[in-house]
Regions:
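Active-site catalytic microenvironments for nucleophilic, acid-base chemistry
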Residues: 6, 28, 32, 175, ...
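Basic, Lys/Arg- and aromatic-enriched nucleic-acid-binding interface segment
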Residues: 6-23, 31-105, 113, 124-128, ...
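Active-site/catalytic core of tyrosine-dependent DNA strand-transfer enzymes
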Residues: 11, 25, 65-72, 114, ...
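A short, basic/aromatic helix-end/turn motif that makes direct DNA contacts
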Residues: 104-110, 195-196
Length: 196
């Protein structure tokens, strides 16, 4: 509590991550017999009674998202669209990855033998290598993507040696009539669906 109190209201996002990491370390210590008792960094039933909720400390801004109940219909509509931006959007939704991770995806990261997409640490927000399973639907999408000469990218842009612009998917959403949602909002759509 003494570690978190000074930063809880000043830098709530960082404080929340620090609390989470402390909780994980103490849980691991308990699991390996290095400590006993309750975890003092646990949020539910402990710190939630001692510290204000993050929503009370700072305004959390959510990205406008598609309701999960409309996702199936949207995916069918998306499949009918032509162009790389739509395929990039489809891959973003299928993998729950960030826009930058999908647009920066390179053929060298894709292993269709093991059905794994390995995103290198330097392209991840958390600076850790991330492995994404390639589902049958994603594999089909990847197999249909055109290979552009001398481009390492799955979704090459107009400028030589550059990936597709990060605005391309958002513009695709707008052309489809979905200007009220964002690409990043699909991560929230997935979270809501998984929570049901």
């Amino acid at each position: 509590l003494e570690i978190l109190k000074p930063i809880w209201t000043k830098i709530p996002e960082t404080a929340s991550r620090v609390r989470n990491r402390i909780e994980l370390v103490l849980d691991a210590a308990k699991a390996t017999g290095l400590r006993e008792g309750e975890n003092p960094a646990r949020w539910r039933g402990h710190l939630d009674k001692l510290l204000p909720k993050r929503s009370k400390v700072s305004k959390v801004r959510h990205h406008p998202a598609l309701p999960w109940t409309e996702a199936s219909r949207f995916m069918k509509e998306l499949a009918q669209q032509t162009g790389l931006a739509y395929r990039a959007l489809e891959m973003t939704i299928l993998t729950c990855c960030r826009t930058s991770e999908v647009l920066g995806a390179q053929w060298s990261e894709i292993d269709l033998k093991t059905d794994t997409w390995t995103i290198p640490a330097e392209r991840m927000k958390a600076d850790k290598e991330h492995r994404v399973p390639i589902t049958a639907q994603l594999k089909s999408l990847l197999e249909q993507l055109p290979r552009v000469d001398n481009s390492p990218y799955l979704f090459p842009g107009q400028k030589k040696g550059q990936p597709l612009s990060n605005m391309s998917m958002l513009m695709g959403l707008r052309r489809m009539g979905y200007s009220h949602i964002t690409v990043h909002g699909f991560r929230s759509t997935f979270r809501d669906w998984a929570g049901e």
